[in-house]
């Protein structure tokens, strides 16, 4: 959450867009070069020199080594690896409606707190819950334990109640060609609001945005049906469902739970349409741009001194262009890697089929970026959220006994904290890319049963993953503001 609110009113006269593209491409070309950089802790207020060049080189080599090892393994070995399950127990859906109704009630209270509670984003539970507990904490839990959002989302329970009270009405069908495009557009709007809007932390502003989104989504579910709109229109459900495929908990159609390897559920996923592929790439590019947009390098492109940041209002145009450009460049690089891989393997599969299947390997990378990028915010702002929930309307309440808790911001401040935080973040980034290579190989064998062709098809995509590993570590290490 930190760093989203407007930081000043001074405006500057720049013409940044004309200068941006060549310089932006330059940084993507230069980031693979391992050079000393500055590591940062929460909000990057503390920087110290660390041998990050060794981490960058080591991360790139680890991802490359993963590809080489997998290329030499027999296909049946990995097939047995992915299919292993440890059965647990059955878990029914009986309480799902009640849990969703409780979630909706909590959401309504948060909206009221946003409108009538404290104006301080670190004291009001609405921005802390949405930007920290939901967008960071729940994404992490979803990636570890599976689709918790299907129970926690605030639409399912109210939809069931309305359907029961007024009966099942005839619903309109969404055109098949729409696919995930509604969710893509809404996710792009969400990313713009989070990263570009001058004050997404403002409680009242966020309350109006979140409340309006809930109403529009609920209306769409009544018109087009809960399942159809959830699968292709409601971006949070689409995103959380995709992330849940990486989890180590699997639930079959009979409701039985079992342990599986991380990413195992991605191997059997159906190919995504063009819109689904675009959605996953947007999920990765948006969090990547969030990191890039705060770097000294980014500000330097436009002659902005990061120590005299003019405020988010002054960089709305720059940010909007950068958000879109980041998606376009990532999508172009991904498609190019798929095209080259298909040609190397002599594949007869269409580009859409290959890209729609292999894009599932982006999920571990997107999840790793999300966790690594927002880890410091989760550790600090999560404490503020726990405190704020005890007194949602700033009336002096202490509902859970946490209103007066001491916030331990030192957990991410200082040289020692910067060292361990950098190591955890770097480890998450590297592990995410290594798992992505593993998943990509499993998916490639579905396209190319011949092991040699499967390995050849993955070479360009692995090069892209190595480059993105370096880029991700550079983002974590380079000096940044905000």
List the model feature ranges, each with a label.
Residues 164-366, 376-379, 383:
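Long, contiguous internal "core" modules enriched in hydrophobic/ aromatic residues
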Residues 349-421:
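C-terminal structural cap/anchor segments
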Residues 39, 55-260, 289:
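Transmembrane-helix bundle segments that line or gate the permeation/cavity pathway
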Residues 42-58, 120-131, 266-267, 304-321, ...:
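Membrane-interface segments at the starts/ends of alpha-helical transmembrane spans
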Residues 179-180, 315-330, 401-432:
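Hydrophobic alpha-helical transmembrane segments
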Residues 15-39:
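N-terminal secretory/membrane targeting signals
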Residues 440-464:
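Interfacial loop-to-transmembrane junctions
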Residues 472-482:
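Juxtamembrane boundary at the C-terminal end of a transmembrane helix
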């Amino acid at each position: 959450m930190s760093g989203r609110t407007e930081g000043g009113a001074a405006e500057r006269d720049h013409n940044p867009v004309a200068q941006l593209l060549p310089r932006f491409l330059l940084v993507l070309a230069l980031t693979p070069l391992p050079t000393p950089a500055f590591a940062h802790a929460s909000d990057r207020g503390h920087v110290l020199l660390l041998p990050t060049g060794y981490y960058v080189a080591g991360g790139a080599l680890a991802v490359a080594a993963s590809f080489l090892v997998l290329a030499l393994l027999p296909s049946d070995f990995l097939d047995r690896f992915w299919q292993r399950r440890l059965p647990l127990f059955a878990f029914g859906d009986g309480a799902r409606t009640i849990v969703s109704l409780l979630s909706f009630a909590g959401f309504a209270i948060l909206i009221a707190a946003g409108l009538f509670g404290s104006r301080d984003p670190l004291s009001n539970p609405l921005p802390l819950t949405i930007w920290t507990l939901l967008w960071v904490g729940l994404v992490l839990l979803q990636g570890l334990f599976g689709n918790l959002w299907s129970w926690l989302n605030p639409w399912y329970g109210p939809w069931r109640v309305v359907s029961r009270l007024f009966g099942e009405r005839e619903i309109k069908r969404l055109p098949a060609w729409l696919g995930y495009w509604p969710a893509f557009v809404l996710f792009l709007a969400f990313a713009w609001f989070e990263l570009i809007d001058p004050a997404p932390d403002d409680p009242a502003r966020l309350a109006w945005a979140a409340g309006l989104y809930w109403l529009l989504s609920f209306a769409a579910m009544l018109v087009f049906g809960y399942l159809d709109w959830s699968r292709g229109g409601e971006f949070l459900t689409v995103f959380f469902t995709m992330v849940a495929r990486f989890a180590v908990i699997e639930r079959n159609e009979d409701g039985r739970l079992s342990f599986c390897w991380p990413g195992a559920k991605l191997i059997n996923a159906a190919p995504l349409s063009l819109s689904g592929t675009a959605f996953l790439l947007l999920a990765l590019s948006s969090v990547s741009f969030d990191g890039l947009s705060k770097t000294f390098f980014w500000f330097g492109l436009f002659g902005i001194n990061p120590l005299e940041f003019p405020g988010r209002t002054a960089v709305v145009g720059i940010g909007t262009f950068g958000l879109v450009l980041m998606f376009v460049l990532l999508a172009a690089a991904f498609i190019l890697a798929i095209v080259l891989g298909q040609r190397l393997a002599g594949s007869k599969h269409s580009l859409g089929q290959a890209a729609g299947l292999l894009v599932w390997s982006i999920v571990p990378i997107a999840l790793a970026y999300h966790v690594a990028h927002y880890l410091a915010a989760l550790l600090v702002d999560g404490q503020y959220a726990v405190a704020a929930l005890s007194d949602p309307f700033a009336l002096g309440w202490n509902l859970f006994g946490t209103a007066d808790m001491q916030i331990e911001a030192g957990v991410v401040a200082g040289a020692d904290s910067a060292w361990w935080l950098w190591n955890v973040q770097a480890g998450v980034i590297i592990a995410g890319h290594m798992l992505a290579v593993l998943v990509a190989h499993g998916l490639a064998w579905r396209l190319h049963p011949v092991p040699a062709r499967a390995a050849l098809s993955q070479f360009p995509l692995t090069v892209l993953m190595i480059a993105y590993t370096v880029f991700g570590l550079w983002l974590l290490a380079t000096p940044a503001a905000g």
